[in-house]
UniProtKB/Swiss-Prot annotation:
Its EC number is 5.4.99.24. SMART domains: S4. PROSITE patterns: PSI_RLU, S4. This is Ribosomal large subunit pseudouridine synthase C. GO terms for biological process: enzyme-directed rRNA pseudouridine synthesis. Keywords: Isomerase, RNA-binding, rRNA processing. The active site is at D144. InterPro entries: PsdUridine_synth_cat_dom_sf, PsdUridine_synth_RluA-like_CS, PsdUridine_synth_RluC/D, PsdUridine_synth_RsuA/RluA, RluA_PseudoU_synthase, S4_RNA-bd, S4_RNA-bd_sf. Belongs to the pseudouridine synthase RluA family. GO terms for molecular function: 23S rRNA pseudouridine(955/2504/2580) synthase activity; pseudouridine synthase activity; RNA binding. Residues 20-83 form the S4 RNA-binding domain. The gene is rluC.
């Protein structure tokens, strides 16, 4: 066993940390400690706020003094972290923008945004290892594991609140590039179809169009046509799970190499292009800076595999 923090810590809550639940605060502070252990030390009174016992749902206030006891975690977890150091180092090359308030990353395909569900490494865990001095690092939004591109991370709670408000007001614009099956029809500029999320017996999440689902809208624009495929820009108005992927399928144009909603025959037509990952890339994000109010537009370049795929398709003659 290894001690996560070897002595009792007394932490004074700052204005930026105020407003969050004590359990969430401890999960962020005691990295690698299971949730069950967090709730156990709170329930047993080992964690105290202003010298008094509290419940897991207690919301911290500015100036609160939190007593955090020594917590022991398995050394096996430490070994797993060290084994991922190469991935952590690679994340440093993916940073597109960073200041005191936020960090913007070009997330690689195949990397989850969060560890869990059998995954020991995610982007947020990697960033916390890369920036151990950062007191606060939280995802503003999510990207599917196989989707690459712009991912926004808040470095202050005030920044997270501001950016979440922009998401709620739909003032943040996200633009994706997707390679879809067949010839996308020019008149199809938006898909409005309610989406319902189902959990299969295997635990896999599957989303489908259903009248019982939540209202969902994605806008589409043709970027380039090829013999068997179309490169489209997809801009989600709402932010449902797998929204672009399911809306593209609903339009009759599933995304290339989508192992959940795609067509294998289409994937086979792309043999020779070097593509073997989902062709969905968060290409650009426009938002207001949470501190300055400046309008920012961050773009993420395509990775080599996506870029080479498009070059191969162009060589096979672009459809005019």
């Amino acid at each position: 066993m290894k001690t996560n923090n070897p002595v009792v810590q007394l932490i004074t809550i700052s204005a930026d940390e105020a407003g969050q639940r004590i359990d969430n605060f401890l999960l962020a502070k005691l990295k690698g400690v299971p949730k069950s252990m967090i709730y156990r030390i709170v329930r047993k009174g080992e964690v105290r706020v202003n010298k008094g016992r509290i419940k897991p749902e207690y919301k911290l206030a500015d100036g609160d003094v939190v007593r955090v006891p020594p917590v022991r975690v398995a050394e096996r977890e430490e070994v797993q972290v060290s084994a991922k150091l190469d991935k952590v180092a690679a994340l440093a090359d993916c940073i597109l923008f960073e200041d005191d308030y936020l960090l913007v990353l070009n997330k690689p395909s195949g990397t989850a945004v969060h560890g869990g569900s059998g995954l020991s490494f995610g982007v947020i865990e990697g960033l916390r290892a890369l920036r151990p001095e950062a007191r606060f690092l939280e995802l503003v939004h999510r990207l599917d594991r196989d989707t690459s591109g712009v991912l926004l991370v808040a470095k202050k709670r005030s920044a997270l609140r501001s950016l979440h408000e922009q998401l709620r007001l739909k003032s943040m614009q996200k633009d994706y590039l997707a390679l879809v099956r067949g010839q996308w029809q020019s008149h199809c500029k938006a898909i409005q179809a309610p989406l319902l999320k189902n959990i299969m017996q295997s635990g896999e999440r599957v989303v489908k169009v259903s009248s019982e689902g939540k209202p969902s809208e994605t806008r589409f624009k043709i970027e380039e046509r090829f013999e068997h495929a179309t490169l489209v820009k997809a801009s989600p108005v709402t932010g449902r799970t797998h929204q672009i992927r399911v809306h593209a399928l609903h339009a009759g144009h599933p995304i290339a190499f989508d192992d959940r909603y795609g067509y294998r025959e289409f994937d086979q037509q792309l043999q020779g292009t070097g593509l073997h990952r989902l062709f969905l890339h968060a290409a650009a994000l426009r938002f207001e800076h949470p501190n300055t109010g400046e309008t920012m537009r961050i773009e993420a370049p395509l990775d080599n595999q996506l870029r080479h795929c498009l070059l191969a398709l162009r060589k096979n003659a672009t459809v005019k």
